[in-house]
A protein has these predicted regions:
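N-terminal cap/lid segment of alpha/beta-hydrolase-fold proteins
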Residues: 3-47
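Short beta-strand/loop motif that positions the catalytic acidic residue
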Residues: 259, 265-267
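Alpha/beta-hydrolase-fold enzymes
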Residues: 139-224
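The serine-hydrolase catalytic nucleophile loop
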Residues: 59-71, 85
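Catalytic histidine-centered segment of alpha/beta-hydrolase-like enzymes
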Residues: 302-314
Length: 330
């Protein structure tokens, strides 16, 4: 396995809590990629604890929103771990700045592998939290991994749908889909000729005055002191242009209605992305024999990025999330 070089100083975009301990750890997935993570434990905790793995948003790093969720849930009595997915952040994987519906789902399962063998973790009490694009990956992991007893998604993106169909399904005609595939495959040829990948750019900067409101929201998080991080793809030069190509014909939520374990999906009413959670929830409960432990929570007056860090509104319903995990990791 690759030896990672991890930053030891505290370089998160949120303050360090005095209520938890923190240390860097590594683990590997079944493709041999070594992943970097921050492990948070409640101070003075005894015995075997329920554990939660956290990842996302898509293009973010563990020093941003996922770390905030992990640290906060550790303050509330859980052993938690925020990790960088394969090919990004401090984690391994070549080429860089790629995403894969298979490998990134496996990243969540590998996190469960790691947590399951920790001496102070109860392996029967493991949950996951997926934020933004990793919300869809979390549901995909829950559909295949019976060790995951509870799943929370926050401001979820369906990365298969948005890559294939564009925002609001605005690029889903047969001709548009064909032209998208044609363009991406030409890009592959060009990159193979030059031997170098082209980055697509992170959040647009400078920000045009006529940018959609959600792009302005992304800018306010990723490009300012609120959430900027040097290793974040969204804060800097973005994903490889062809890095998300495999999502075009690999629908990650295909088997979500086979999830038996508990699921809480959280979204802001005013989020541009809210349709992802509404539709995913409807598909998840369709013909699913286990619907009593599934819940969709829509929060009024909240936009997509408010659920990254609270948006200055205390928007993240940590009390609700805590109660959900207490109920389902027991």
């Amino acid at each position: 396995m690759a030896q990672l070089h991890l930053t030891e100083e505290w370089d998160k975009v949120f303050p360090k809590s005095e209520k938890v301990t923190h240390r860097k750890v590594t683990f590997h997935n079944r493709y041999g990629i070594t992943l970097a993570a921050d492990l948070y434990e409640p101070i003075h905790a005894d015995g075997k604890l329920p554990a939660i793995a956290v990842c996302g948003p898509f293009g973010a790093v563990k020093e941003q929103a996922s770390g905030l969720y992990a640290q906060t849930m550790a303050e509330r009595g859980f052993l938690t771990m925020a990790f960088d997915p394969s090919f990004t952040g401090e984690s391994g994987g070549e080429s860089r700045y790629m995403a894969s519906p298979d490998i990134n789902t496996e990243d969540f399962q590998a996190a469960v592998d790691f947590l399951s063998v920790q001496e102070n973790v109860d392996p029967e009490k493991i949950g996951i939290i997926g934020i933004c694009g990793w919300g869809g990956m979390a549901l995909n992991a829950a559909a295949i991994d019976t060790r995951i007893k509870a799943t929370v998604t926050a401001t979820m993106y369906d990365m298969s749908r948005v890559n294939a169909n564009g925002y609001f399904d605005s690029e889903n005609s047969e001709e548009q889909c064909y032209e998208k595939r044609k363009s991406l495959n030409q890009q592959r040829t060009d990159e193979y000729k030059t031997g170098a990948y082209v980055l697509g750019g992170g959040v647009v900067d400078p920000l045009p005055e006529d940018a959609p409101f959600f792009v302005k929201d992304y800018y306010d998080y990723y490009k300012t002191d609120r959430g900027y991080h040097v290793r974040s793809l969204n804060s800097n030069e973005g994903w490889n242009v062809t890095g998300c190509m495999s999502f075009l014909n690999m629908p990650i939520l295909q088997y979500s209605n086979e999830i038996r374990s508990a699921v809480l999906m959280i979204h802001g009413e005013k989020a541009h992305s809210c349709y992802f959670s509404k539709d995913a929830f409807a598909n998840m409960i369709k013909d699913n024999p286990c619907v009593e432990n599934k819940e969709l929570m829509i929060i009024p007056d909240i936009v997509h990025t408010d659920l990254y860090d609270g948006g200055g509104k205390n928007a993240i319903p940590f009390d609700k999330i805590t109660a959900f995990f207490h109920e389902n990791l027991k």
